[in-house]
């Protein structure tokens, strides 16, 4: 749909009756919830003397950072805390969620890169064992449907650790459970575009390790293919999370979906915005990659009869954003402000409020 004329029949500035705020996190600075709350504060300050609009804030995630919080906030689920192992087999406390009969799992809760000190990161040793423990905990509680966010892993073990932690129960889980993977990664398991070559260097692997990890993944895929009679190692997303994508696709017949789109569907986003007249989304930095399936672009695809603003920490390619259909493109960070200053949470919070007030004054 051509959105360029949609905004002409909606008023600018104040006068909005219902506003939906659904921003991704400003990574390394503010969570999705904190960004949303800052925008809401700016809206409320401007409308203080008028009839305040209804404001609905929706925590967002693309399947990585913040996915668990986003689902539980939107769908009012239960938070479950367990003891499990991290990627170096150290005992930690980790959380997952249960919404109705579905478990919401972030692999980063157990196999997360952020849990491992930089000097200890080693994907040759890192294991997804703790993820297997978490899935088993939910399974024993009666959960049979799983949504798994694949972002932020420290591992490159193709899910072998997860499968070992399940023991023979992986066969029952395969028969009885369904898995949906939240990930925007489309890489295969092996080769120059695979898990080892593309992602392992970010997890501490040197060139020799990368080759060894790729060889290990290839051998595991060959053995698995002989066992099942089919091979998912080339499937889009098999290379996600150090090959965990492959393990779920090959062993549990998982369905892989873009994380942002999955969240929007699960929370009923289309119904929520039906009677809204303004949607505000954003992220830490918006550029042409934003239009390649990142959260703001996914939200843009759902917006038809509403205005939509893109409110991000930084913005490149502003014209491309406007041409794509955003009615306003707002950079909250002043041009002259150094990045290290702008990344301070309190500074970013205040920048957002000021930028929103200025937009409503237009």
Residue ranges and their predicted role:
Residues 7-362:
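N-terminal loops that bind phosphate or other acidic moieties
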């Amino acid at each position: 749909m051509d959105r360029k004329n949609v905004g002409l029949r909606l008023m600018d500035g104040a006068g909005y009756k219902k506003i939906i705020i659904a921003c991704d996190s400003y990574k390394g600075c503010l969570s999705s919830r904190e960004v949303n709350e800052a925008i809401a504060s700016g809206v409320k300050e401007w409308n203080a003397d008028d009839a305040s609009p209804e404001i609905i804030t929706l925590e967002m995630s693309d399947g990585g950072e913040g996915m668990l919080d986003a689902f539980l906030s939107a769908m009012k689920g239960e938070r479950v805390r367990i003891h499990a192992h991290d990627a170096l087999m150290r005992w930690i406390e980790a959380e997952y969620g249960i919404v109705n009969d579905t478990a919401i799992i972030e692999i980063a809760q157990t196999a997360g890169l952020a849990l491992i000190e930089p000097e200890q990161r080693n994907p040759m040793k890192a294991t997804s064992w703790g993820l297997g423990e978490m899935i088993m905990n939910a399974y024993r509680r009666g959960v049979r449907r799983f949504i798994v966010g694949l972002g932020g892993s420290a591992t490159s073990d193709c899910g072998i650790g997860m499968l070992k932690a399940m023991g023979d129960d992986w066969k029952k889980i395969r028969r009885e459970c369904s898995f949906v993977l939240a990930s925007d990664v489309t890489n295969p398991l092996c080769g120059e575009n695979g898990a080892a070559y593309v992602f392992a260097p970010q997890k501490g692997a040197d060139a020799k390790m990368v080759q060894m990890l790729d060889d290990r993944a290839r051998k595991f895929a060959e053995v698995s293919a002989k066992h099942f009679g089919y091979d998912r190692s080339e499937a889009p997303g098999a290379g996600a999370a150090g090959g965990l994508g492959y393990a779920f696709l090959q062993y549990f017949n998982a369905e892989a979906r873009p994380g942002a789109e999955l969240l929007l569907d699960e929370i009923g986003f289309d119904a929520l915005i039906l009677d809204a007249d303004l949607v505000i989304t954003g992220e830490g930095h918006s550029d042409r990659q934003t239009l390649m399936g990142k959260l703001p672009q996914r939200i843009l695809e759902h917006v038809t009869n509403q205005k939509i603003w893109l409110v991000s920490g930084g913005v490149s390619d502003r014209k491309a954003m406007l041409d794509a259909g955003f009615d306003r493109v707002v950079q909250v960070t002043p041009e002259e402000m150094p990045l290290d200053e702008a990344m301070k949470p309190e500074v970013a919070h205040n920048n957002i409020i000021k930028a929103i007030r200025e937009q409503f004054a237009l």
